[in-house]
Regions:
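Conserved short alpha-helical segments that host acidic/polar catalytic motifs at enzyme active sites
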Residues: 1-159, 165-234
């Protein structure tokens, strides 16, 4: 059940992760965790991704701590400075460099920083919107449009390999984490079957698919519409 949680006494080391993904190299990712000295408690791709990001989150926090502890500041001040200096794009680049598969995932760190990341092939979809009050990411555009009463062009698509990062102070940035693949391969089944038909692009695509099927259907039924029943796929 999403989100998965990685708890720690340090807020900056705690992580919650949720998303829509299917990784194809879980064996390799699991082995990498073993080689780093970990003993993962689970083999599922969700857990492996959580620990993969968590590992580099720990390293980023430790790096900042090692530099700040020499500044003669007290523990609370050091903790707050670490949270301010956390480089989310940097740790996402390191964590995701060997991932293979389709994913649109969202995470939030205990200190309040949040992020969303889309796979570089564009297999899974992700859309975002933000203004002075809110920042939102969802796998489908109509959900955001309906919730915030927005027009189609107000909601933007997160590009393949791109991350949407929100710092706890409200600063928002878009960062290219992984190089966008030359050939973008969105999941056709997701667009044809799973996606909401109220989306502008999905509606047009489905109408076009129906239009392209018409000649084959007419040929298959031999123009006998009186004895043909048309039905939606349940």
């Amino acid at each position: 059940v999403h989100p998965l949680l990685r708890r720690n006494n340090w807020a900056s080391r705690s992580l919650a992760l949720a998303g829509n993904f299917n990784m194809t190299n879980v064996d390799e990712m699991f082995q990498q965790l073993l080689e780093e000295g970990q003993h993962p408690r689970d083999y599922a791709d969700t857990f492996v991704m959580l620990e993969s990001i968590g590992h580099y989150l720990d390293r980023e926090v430790q790096y900042q701590y090692d530099h700040l502890e020499k500044s003669n500041k007290n523990g609370q001040d050091v903790s707050h400075l670490i949270e301010e200096k956390l480089d989310i794009p940097f740790l996402l680049k390191r964590a995701s460099k060997n991932w293979d598969g389709g994913y649109a995932l969202c995470g939030i760190i205990g200190c309040g920083d949040a992020f969303a990341l889309r796979d570089p092939w564009g297999i899974r979809t992700a859309f975002y919107y933000y203004d002075d009050e809110v920042a939102v990411v969802a796998s489908e555009r109509p959900v955001i449009q309906t919730a915030f009463n927005l027009k189609k062009d107000d909601v933007h698509e997160l590009q393949p390999g791109e991350a949407f990062v929100v710092k706890r102070n409200g600063k928002i940035s878009l960062n290219q984490i992984l190089n966008k693949k030359e050939k973008i391969t969105p999941c056709s089944f997701e667009r044809i079957y799973f996606s909401r038909g109220s989306d502008y692009d999905i509606y047009r695509e489905r109408k076009k698919l129906g239009e392209l099927l018409v000649p084959e259907i007419i040929e298959a039924i031999d123009d006998d519409f009186d004895n043909t029943v048309f039905s939606f796929i349940p």
